[in-house]
Each structure stands twice: as structure tokens, then as C-alpha cells.
Amino acid sequence: MPLSPRPLLVAATAAAAALALTSCTSREETPAAPSSGGGPAASAQSVAPSADGCTLEKTGYAKVDLKTAVVGFSQSEKEANPFRIAETQSIKDEAAKLGIASDKLLVTNAQSDLNRQISDIKSLLDRGAQLLIVAPLNSDGLQPALDAAKAKKVPVVTIDRKVTSQPCTDYLTFIGSNFVEQGKRAAQAMVKATGGTGKVAILLGSSGNNVTTDRTQGFKDELAKTTGLSVVAEQTGEFDRSKGQAVMEQLIQSHPDITAVYAENDEMGVGAVNALKTAGKTPGKDVKVVSIDGTRNAVQLIADGSYNAVIESNPRFGPLAFQTLQKFESGEAIPASIVITDDQYDETNASQKVGNAY
């Protein structure tokens, strides 16, 4: 499925400045706010060098020419998930755009196995990777792989999930969303969809990573401000459509009075919709559905009236990941976290913006 050229909008937390990246511009402008429209945002502001940031000099690593370097990308999960498909494709597309030869981009997939991801990263290093981009499976457990990269003085950019290791020591930086904020925005969308009353079921993501923890915290903290909505059930669907559907089927039986579902990714949300339809309920109306990601399937369901809102979590990390590596190699300071700001889909814009989804 073709990817929309809509950019990632980013905010570098350590620099207290917003970043917005597109694949077609490198000019500096004033910091950009999150886009509310469907068109591409045109700003791309650099992160100012800072004593608090991580620099090539501070790490003592040798300078590498990105265009001729061997770059390794470690994907964490099987690419049956639209997020992972788009994420990997974005890395490949940006590498090609930069003129990196296909045999200089090494890609592995851990198939949701932590030990395999550790082995994959070590294998990438053994195969000569000079720069690494890693989509961690879990927040914990990758230290042996990060130690191996550090021993070879290979910078590591982590994307999507934050690891508990030390930035600028064990890895260069984290690029990803503010997952607590995503949860809060999902709760706000739920309040709007339900009118602030009802019984909510939460389909949790997989355990052991900050995405699930933060999206749950943000949602519950925000929902607590509304007295008419209560969480009556929560169970993990492992970020998987079929598991989300199975969990929803169970929850319909045990809690037939559920009036709203918060799924911590779209795949589980789509699974919940399938379960609700099978049970004779009308998702989007009888039972409100809000999730996080921005997949085309979920956004189309909003347009069709079977879903209520999606908070985007943009997987197109390629341009920003490579831009960050380029800045690091040129001597600029890189903040510990680069946080992207995500869009939102609901009944007011889904039909117009479905082309931006992945």
C-alpha cells in the first residue's frame, strides 16, 4: 500500500523546540504546531547544538559518511502489522533517497522474540554495520546488544519504543511519540464520543514496554477528570487484531453493558469492531471505539461510521532517523529524546484525510 508523503512533526524535548520534518525540504522556519489539515507541513527546523546534547566528540566515535556507510536496521515485530510495514518501508525509502546502496542497508526482523533481536543486532555489527537504527521489542532487555554496539563505537538511534538504558552512553537518542499524551488525547476523544458517560473496556497492548504503560496511564489520568465514565474491564490483546477480537468477545460476555472501547492500537480496535458486529452490536454507535495508530483500516472505519476516533502514532521514522544520524556525524548535538507530535482522525476529517493513513 502506498505511503502518504505527509511528514512527521517533531518536538525535540531537550532543546525545548519543535521540529517538523518533511522528505522534500531542509529549510529552517519557525517551530511548527501539529497540523490539523491533510496537506504536507513545509517546515524543518534544526535542533540547536547544546552542551546537554550528545555529540560525536563527546562519544569519541569516529566520523562516518552516511552515504557510503553500512547501516543496520533491526525491526522488532513481524510485518503483519501495518505500523511495522510502514516503519520498515520508510527506512528503506529514505535510505534509497539518500543514495545508500541497497547492499549497504542491512535489515533484520526479530519476529517478536527479544533474544532474536539481541542476536540480530549483534549479527548486524558482525556484518559491518557502522550505524544502527533499532525499533526495540521491549523497553528492557536489549542491554547486551547495546553494549556490543558501544564496544564497536557504533551509534544507535532507537525509534518508537524507549529503552531503559542511558542515552548518549548506551544509545544515541530515542525518536518517538509522547505516549502519555496519546493516551490523554484518546480519553478526550472518548469523552467527546460518549458525551462523558458510559462504561469503558480497555484493550491493553503487550506488556514490558513503555508504549502500553504510558498509553494506559495517560488515558486513565485524563478519564479520571470525568465522573460519568468508568473503566469496567481491561485485558491485553497484545497489539494484535485476532487477539483483540478474542478478548473483546470475552468482554462482551462478561460485561454486556460496555458502551465504549479504548484500544491501545488500531489492530486491536479493528478486532474489537469485528467482535461487536458478530455480537449484533453497532460499533461507533452502540459502542464507541477509540484507538491509537492511524492505520488506513481504522481511519476508513471512522469514515464509514463504525469507529469514533484514532490518535495517530506516525510510523514513518525514516527521514528523521537518517537526518538525526547526519546531524550527529556532522558534529551537532543530539537531544536524548526527539518527540514527534501526532495527528488525529475523527468524523470531521477521516474521509478527507484517509489518504494520510498507512
Where are these regions (language model features)?
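C-terminal motif of bacterial Sec signal peptides marking the signal peptidase cleavage site
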Residues: 19-23
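Hydrophobic alpha-helical segments within soluble ligand-binding/sensing domains
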Residues: 56-59, 66, 71, 92, ...
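Hydrophobic alpha-helical
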Residues: 134-150, 219, 233, 237-300
